[in-house]
């Protein structure tokens, strides 16, 4: 088994996030982020909901405190069911950020660096 190491340090955040998939749009919370990846979770109203497939392409919008949004295209690195309740399913997703504008990447780098020190 090959274990992939992260290339960049991740920082803990709690940013509202919108994820657009082929099945529609969902709102979630980003829990950690780096310059090239993020972990987020969201509640799906269907208790039978399945996680997204690895390698699926999605669009993501991170609502950063201070009235700033970071938009990116991303690849689902992994996805899993975190919890199932009567009325919903909690899903977790690891994303690889693929296409981020230069301006947003610079903002993200500055934000991450500021949280590290």
Question: How does the language model describe each region?
Answer:
Residues 13, 84-117:
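C-terminal output/interaction extensions
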Residues 15-20, 51-69:
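Short conserved beta-strand and strand-loop elements enriched in small hydrophobics
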Residues 22-24, 35-36, 79-85, 102:
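Short, conserved beta-turn/loop elements at beta-strand boundaries and strand-helix junctions
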Residues 27-30, 72-79:
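Short beta-strand-centered aromatic/proline hotspots
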Residues 46-48, 82-83:
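Short beta-strands and strand-coil junctions in structured, solvent-facing domains, enriched
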